[in-house]
Amino acid sequence: MSFYAAANPNAIPAPHIEYRALLPMLIVFGVACAGVLVEAFVPRAQRALTQTVLALGGLVAALIAVVSNTGLPRKLVAQSAIAADGPTLFIQGTILALSIGALLLIADRSIGADSDFVAQAADLPGSEQERASVQAGLRQTEVFPLAMFAVGGMMLFPAANDLITAFVALEVLSLPLYLLAGMARRRRLLSQEAAVKYFLLGAFSSAFFVYGLALVYGYAKSVEYGDIATALTASDRGDSLIIVGLALIGISLLFKLSGVPFHWWTPDVYQGAPTPITAFMAAGTKVAAFGALLRVFFVAFGGLAWDWRPVIWGVAIATMVVGAILGITQTDVKRLLAYSSIAHAGFVLTAFAATTRASESSVLFYLVAYGFMTIGAFAIVILVRDGDGEANHLSRWVGLGRRSPLVAGIFALFLLAMAGLPPTSGLWAKVAVFTAAYQGGAGPLVIVGVLASAVTAYYYLRIIVLMFAQEPAVEGPTVAVPGALASAAIALGVIVTVVLGIVPQPVLDLADKAVPFLR
């Protein structure tokens, strides 16, 4: 106790901050702030390289910090606002690894001058200012600090131990993504439409979260997860105040992970956003949202499991069915992958509904496998191009296996992983979640999941047949040669997908060792 505190017993004590436990997030947010300063003070010609080195270096340093923290005791830090436990470290490490892959795609500018991002975000589509910016060779580098802020929010979201911290994290990860979604160079109006839709629906989602937070506080007199759980055990669990509050918070979380019926933004945003940003959102945001969902429902509202489990069952079934059936009708490869991500969210929810330790670890493993196959798949989408940008219509992919066997083969590998076929990580990911769901008493969900997997396998295999079993068009698309950074991102996805398909046990053991969540 300081002399001032001893002399003033009514003084507010200074908070004790465990900087070692917070170091990974501090590094990421520090790099994001440094990136803003780079935009202000570094000459334009040097910004791209500076931002790339700064961002990649920061992500690697943060990942090293996460690994170094694995030996620390599990405890609540930052005045109990953040849980420094096994799931936090596992999810943060996954987010950082996926962010490195996504940032490699964002930084790669080898396919034409700024083929993915508009030269100046403020330029109107088709305007003279936009043409002048392109002719001047201007490069959009604000994406780096924006992406780093989003990564920081993704890391904080599943680590939050109270609803206010979770809401702050939700906004920190969401606001940069609203901007990044509108920065596509090609199809500018579609990109800006995607950004507006994402922003408006995201604002409604945030409003639901805040309203639910207020109701939960009115019931529990606290926003800390542990205090909420204690209040549930000490009073009437069926109180309408807590039920409505939980429902509103659940809606906000299901929106972020594209659960039905809160999924309608996903195809439009995935299609309109720059493809590297789509990969970043599809992988990183879903991992962070599921991590937050696990902590909120298992730690804070575990006492209401009998109330929310039937709802999760219904959402999981609807999510798998909608993602599988509507995916069949898609002719745009990015929209197809969007519905694929919706179906995958349903598969993860089957294990989540089991509410067992095995379900927690299986969800963590699935998120790792899904994230890397998604990054790799969108990286391949960037390479298949027409004169006006990416060739996203499936008719343009006909015969791709004969034009570029390597690119088509790698894309086929990622599709097989999404279908859950050997020898890929997708097989063991689905085995893990379906086994956990069955053992947890969610057998009907497993049946629906297997049937939905068969339907999704159809549209994955349909693309493979298009690429390898049909003759290419005379004037087909070109396949760009990826630069070193994009090649590294693709290689990362391939390596993780294949290695986890052959030797999944080390990561399964790591996920099992990470759980349970600190309560």
From Swiss-Prot:
Entry's transmembrane regions: 22-42, 53-73, 87-107, 141-161, 163-183, 198-218, 242-262, 287-307, 310-330, 336-356, 363-383, 406-426, 442-461, 483-503
Entry GO CC: plasma membrane
Membrane topology designation: Multi-pass membrane protein
Single Gene Ontology MF annotation: quinone binding
Its EC number(s): 7.1.1.-
A GO BP annotation: ATP synthesis coupled electron transport
Annotated keywords: Cell membrane, Membrane, NAD, Quinone, Translocase, Transmembrane, Transmembrane helix, Transport
Compartments where located: Cell membrane
Function: NDH-1 shuttles electrons from NADH, via FMN and iron-sulfur (Fe-S) centers, to quinones in the respiratory chain. The immediate electron acceptor for the enzyme in this species is believed to be a menaquinone. Couples the redox reaction to proton translocation (for every two electrons transferred, four hydrogen ions are translocated across the cytoplasmic membrane), and thus conserves the redox energy in a proton gradient.
Record NCBIfam families: NDH_I_N, PRK05777.1-4
Family: Belongs to the complex I subunit 2 family.
Name of the protein in its database record: NADH-quinone oxidoreductase subunit N
Species of the source: Acidothermus cellulolyticus (strain ATCC 43068 / DSM 8971 / 11B)
